[in-house]
Every structure is written in C-alpha cells, then in structure tokens.
Amino acid sequence: MSTTRKRLFIKTYGCQMNVYDSDRMKDVLTPLGYESAETPEGADLVILNTCHIREKAAEKVYSELGRLRPLKDEKAASGGMTIAVAGCVAQAEGAEIMKRAPVVDLVVGPQTYHKLPELIAQAHRAKGEALDTEFEVEDKFDRLGSDRQVEGYSAFVTVQEGCDKFCTFCVVPYTRGAEWSRPVDQIVAEIRALAAKGIREVTLLGQNVNAFHGAPPSGREAEGAWGLGQLVRHVALIGGIERIRFTTSHPRDMDEVLIQAFADTPKLMPYFHLPVQAGSDKILKSMNRQHTAEEYVAIIDRLRAARPDIAISGDMIVGFPGETDADFEATLDLVRRVKFASCFSFKYSKRPGTPGAAMFNQVDEGVKSARLAVLQELLSDQQAAFNESMIGRTLPVLFEKPGRMGGQLHGRSPYLQSVHVDGPAELIGQVGEVRIEAASRNSLSGSLTGSKRSAA
C-alpha cells in the first residue's frame, strides 16, 4: 500500500449501479493512498462517473470538464490534477472524449474500472493518455474482491450487468453490454463481508436484475444456474441482513419462483420497481418491450396475490415516436388500474444510435411537455394517496441517521419512504416500530411504539 496521501473526488451521475461502481472505484484506489475529498478543489484525482440514459448526458459531462479545466491549470504548478471520465458516457464516446476535452487524462468504461491503478500510472507516464472501454465483466469482479469500504447501514450490491432486450429507446445494451450474472458464492461473500461491517439492508442491482442467471453455490452445481428468486432466499439466510431489495426488473423476466419469494421471504421488502414505460400496446411494440399492457397488469395481480401488502413503483415515458392522444390515454388508464406507490416519468429523448432516434414520427416537444404534466399530476396524486394510507399503521423502520431536528431520527419504511421520528441515537442501525401519524408526498412522521429489534 502506498504511504503517499492523495485525495480523490468522484462525481456520480445516474443510477444506483453507478453509485455502487463509484464505491468500488474508491476501494480500488485506497491501496494507492487515495482518500476522499469533499470537492474537486481539494483533489489530486477527479473522476466523473457518468450516465448516458437521458438527453444531453454527454454535453453535461463536457460542461463539467470545462469547469474543471481552469482548476487543473491552477494546480499544474503544485503537483497537478488527474481527470478521468468513467461510466456509460465513457463507454459510448471513448477516445472522442479526449479529442473534445484535452483536459481529460484517462477514459475508463464500466467494465474496466478495476484497472484504474494501471491506467493512472499509464496516464502519468510522460503526461500521456489512457483509455480502456473493453467488456471484461468477469475479470472485473474477480479483481474487485469482496472487501468494501462502507458507511451507514444500507448498501448496493451488483449481481447482474448488461441487457439483451434492446428496447428501441435505450442505450444500455450498447454501453453495458450483454447480460451477465455473478456467481452466487461471489455475491454471498460480498454480502457477508458487508453484514460483518454493520450493513443491515442490501439492494441487489442489475440493469435487468430479474434476468439473473448465476452459477449456483459450490457443491450444488447439479442444480444448474440459479434465478433471482433462489438468490434472494439464499441471501436471506445471511446473519445480520434484515432487509433485501432488488432493482431494476423487466416484465419479460418475471417468473413464479421470484413472485413466490415475495410470499415466503419476510426479509424481502414489499416494494417492487417494475418499469412498464407505456400503456399502449402499439407503443410497447414500437419500443420492443416484448410484453403487452395486459401482461404487465397480470404480473402486478400475481404479485399482489402473493404479497397483499406489496407496493408497486414504475417508469413511464411520454411522447415516444408515434404516440397519439389515444395511446397516451391508454397510459393514463394503465396508471389508474395499477395505482402506483411511486413512478418515475420522463419525456422521450433521442439517444444516438438507438432505433427510436431514427423513427420519423417524432412527437412535438410541446405535446410531450403537456402530456408529461398530466401524467405527473396523476402520479403525484397516487403517491400522496399511498403515503396517506400509512397513517394509523405501525411500520418497521430502519433508522439510518440523525434527523435534521435535535432528538430526531431519520429512517426508511419497507416502502422506501423517509420516516422522521423523535428517538434516541442508539436506535440508529436498528429496526424499530413506528406508528405513522402524518404523511406528505415525500415523507412520513410518527412516534415510536416502544418495540424495537436489533439486527438478526
């Protein structure tokens, strides 16, 4: 391990998997002597871990690089600053990033950040440049190991990467590659190490997490690859882990084993994120979603039959090419039927290289904005109604940190709602029962019932 003290600043854009990747980058760089800096001004190495899902994602990165340029020039006389671009913009743009922004020293894709020590050394040699955007997912997790630096009581754990669905609006198959799953033993080793460090809740991550198809535990090879339902049950056996979540799923990969896991695995939280994107079968077909609106609703019905207290969240896109008023009304109808607890909604934006970007019947931006406003009003009302339905209920809350007010605690309900309650600091890291007394669109508040339980 290096004894030279260096400072690292990582700016993370986008999804939970990027948050996980940023944490693992810190793990990789700690043996080199890097410690976290609060701002770029205090850093020797700045990494922009980027997302390419939304419109103008790359331009946002170039704007940030423009802001970093004078800072790098200023530091040139006092040891210098290394700037790296990582993540999905790095994968999509590659060497073009260094052409457009010479301030960048290295570019590393989401499957090769385990090579950061070598790439940094390469970039430092004679002030050169370093680039690696190969797809080497298996090698990455072998190199990363299971030891992680963690804070708090919840952690993300990537179990699956990539996507083979090729939705016509999405860049993920091009930036994250084909679907690949980690072996069960490797995942379990990482989660056991997290539990030993005080983690009480894990969220299993994947671009298509319910497509998980990992090698079974040692000695059980005859069983063949395990699905996500089997993995969830296995993780539930790990001492110290009280709560399990997973995201993000695709309707095509839902199976009865996973649905049944909601019924028979109490540690699996009753909150499920299942994107649908549209309620019109015509638009779903054009998106290449490979399911109909009725098939989506049928999955929700099966989930609610298995776990009556389950809440559903989703994703919606308005203004996809060819969307008519009737298509949009079908989306509103689906939303009314499902009654989402929460739902992310966006205007369609062209992603370069995707089939959707080349479609001729693009929807006017004004129409998109108007439809989004209507949809978001409906979704906001549903979220408020869901939160208000908690009033009078007693919920188990994982207390994560002190609240903003003195003597207050902040925690999360099984449904990922923020919960504020007055209570002693020693409850942090434990699950306590809270009677909900008030609700807003974004949080709940209540009082402790006196019941609490330490982690298993």
UniProtKB/Swiss-Prot annotation:
<keyword id="KW-0479">Metal-binding</keyword>
<feature type="domain" description="MTTase N-terminal">
    <location>
        <begin position="6"/>
        <end position="125"/>
    </location>
</feature>
<keyword id="KW-0004">4Fe-4S</keyword>
<feature type="binding site">
    <location>
        <position position="51"/>
    </location>
    <ligand>
        <name>[4Fe-4S] cluster 1</name>
    </ligand>
</feature>
<dbReference type="InterPro" id="IPR038135">
    <property type="entry name" value="Methylthiotransferase_N_sf"/>
</dbReference>
<feature type="binding site">
    <location>
        <position position="163"/>
    </location>
    <ligand>
        <name>[4Fe-4S] cluster 2</name>
    </ligand>
</feature>
<protein>
    <recommendedName>
        <fullName>tRNA-2-methylthio-N(6)-dimethylallyladenosine synthase</fullName>
        <ecNumber>2.8.4.3</ecNumber>
    </recommendedName>
</protein>
<dbReference type="GO" id="GO:0005829">
    <property type="term" value="C:cytosol"/>
</dbReference>
<dbReference type="Pfam" id="PF04055">
    <property type="entry name" value="Radical_SAM"/>
</dbReference>
<dbReference type="GO" id="GO:0046872">
    <property type="term" value="F:metal ion binding"/>
</dbReference>
<comment type="similarity">
    <text>Belongs to the methylthiotransferase family. MiaB subfamily.</text>
</comment>
<feature type="binding site">
    <location>
        <position position="88"/>
    </location>
    <ligand>
        <name>[4Fe-4S] cluster 1</name>
    </ligand>
</feature>
<keyword id="KW-0411">Iron-sulfur</keyword>
<dbReference type="GO" id="GO:0035597">
    <property type="term" value="F:N6-isopentenyladenosine methylthiotransferase activity"/>
</dbReference>
<feature type="domain" description="Radical SAM core">
    <location>
        <begin position="149"/>
        <end position="385"/>
    </location>
</feature>
<comment type="subunit">
    <text>Monomer.</text>
</comment>
<dbReference type="InterPro" id="IPR007197">
    <property type="entry name" value="rSAM"/>
</dbReference>
<dbReference type="InterPro" id="IPR002792">
    <property type="entry name" value="TRAM_dom"/>
</dbReference>
<dbReference type="InterPro" id="IPR006638">
    <property type="entry name" value="Elp3/MiaA/NifB-like_rSAM"/>
</dbReference>
<feature type="domain" description="TRAM">
    <location>
        <begin position="388"/>
        <end position="450"/>
    </location>
</feature>
<dbReference type="InterPro" id="IPR006463">
    <property type="entry name" value="MiaB_methiolase"/>
</dbReference>
<dbReference type="InterPro" id="IPR005839">
    <property type="entry name" value="Methylthiotransferase"/>
</dbReference>
<dbReference type="Pfam" id="PF01938">
    <property type="entry name" value="TRAM"/>
</dbReference>
<feature type="binding site">
    <location>
        <position position="15"/>
    </location>
    <ligand>
        <name>[4Fe-4S] cluster 1</name>
    </ligand>
</feature>
<keyword id="KW-0808">Transferase</keyword>
<dbReference type="GO" id="GO:0051539">
    <property type="term" value="F:4 iron, 4 sulfur cluster binding"/>
</dbReference>
<dbReference type="Pfam" id="PF00919">
    <property type="entry name" value="UPF0004"/>
</dbReference>
<feature type="binding site">
    <location>
        <position position="170"/>
    </location>
    <ligand>
        <name>[4Fe-4S] cluster 2</name>
    </ligand>
</feature>
<dbReference type="InterPro" id="IPR013848">
    <property type="entry name" value="Methylthiotransferase_N"/>
</dbReference>
<keyword id="KW-0819">tRNA processing</keyword>
<dbReference type="InterPro" id="IPR020612">
    <property type="entry name" value="Methylthiotransferase_CS"/>
</dbReference>
<keyword id="KW-0408">Iron</keyword>
<comment type="function">
    <text>Catalyzes the methylthiolation of N6-(dimethylallyl)adenosine (i(6)A), leading to the formation of 2-methylthio-N6-(dimethylallyl)adenosine (ms(2)i(6)A) at position 37 in tRNAs that read codons beginning with uridine.</text>
</comment>
<keyword id="KW-0949">S-adenosyl-L-methionine</keyword>
<feature type="binding site">
    <location>
        <position position="167"/>
    </location>
    <ligand>
        <name>[4Fe-4S] cluster 2</name>
    </ligand>
</feature>
<dbReference type="InterPro" id="IPR023404">
    <property type="entry name" value="rSAM_horseshoe"/>
</dbReference>
<keyword id="KW-0963">Cytoplasm</keyword>
